[in-house]
Amino acid sequence: MKTTINNKLGVITVALLLSGLVPSTMMAQDKVEASIGADLVSGYIWRGQNLGGVSVQPSLGISYKGLSLGAWGSVGVESKDAKEFDLTIGYSIGGFSVSITDYWFDKTYTGDVDEYGKEIYTTNKYFQYGAYSTAHVFEAQVGYDFGPLAVNWYTNFAGADGVKENGKRAYSSYLALSAPFKLGGLDWTVDLGMVPWETTFYNGYTSGFCVTDISLGASKEIKITDSFSVPTFAKVTVNPRTEGAYFAFGLSF
C-alpha cells in the first residue's frame, strides 16, 4: 500500500497501496537495475482511506528486462499505527503491466476497546498462512498506461480479504484511473478510484459500486544546493463514500 501520495510501487515501476497506486511506463532494459529509497509523509492515505499519521516508508527494488521485484514498508510514529510490509513481483512492457502483491500488517484492530477506552489490537505472525487466520492479503493487478491516462484493475484473490454480507469472500476489487499533466512548473496527477462491488475490505463496508477516491496531487524537486535537491509531493484527497477529506505532504530520499 505504497506512498500516501505517490504510486505505491513507483520504486519498482509496477502499479500498486496505499493511498494508492498508478503504474508508470517501463521499457525492458538489458541490465539489472536496482533502487532504494524512502518517503517521509505527513499522513498515510491509501485509496481514499486513512491508514495512519506521520510515517516513514522505505522501498527497495530490482528489475531486469521488464521483470521486477520490490519490497515496501510503512512505519508510523504513533504506537497505534500498524507496521506494513509488502512484497511485489511484476512484469511490464510498453504501457502494459501486471503484478502480484503480498500485503502484511503486524497488527489488526479488533473493533473493540478496553475498559480505558483504548483500541484493542491483535498481533499478527508473518509466517501464518492459514486460510482463516492469515494477516496477508494477496492482490493481482493488471493495467495499461496510455500516456494521457493510466488504467489499473486490482483484485484480492487470497488471504485476509473482505467479505460480502452473506459471509462469502468478496474478491475485493478496485479500479483506478490516473491522468498526469504539467501546470505552473509542477507535475500534477488527477486520480479517480472506484470499488465495483460489495465488500468489507474498503471503507469498513461498501454495499456496491461507489467512488472512494478523488485526488489531485503535485510534485516538484526543491533545490538545496547546486548538486542536491529533494523531491517533494502533496496531495488533496476526498472520499465520497465516507465523506472523508485529507491533505498530505511528503519528502522523498
Which stretches of residues belong to each language-model region?
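Cleavable N-terminal export/targeting peptides
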Residues: M1-E33
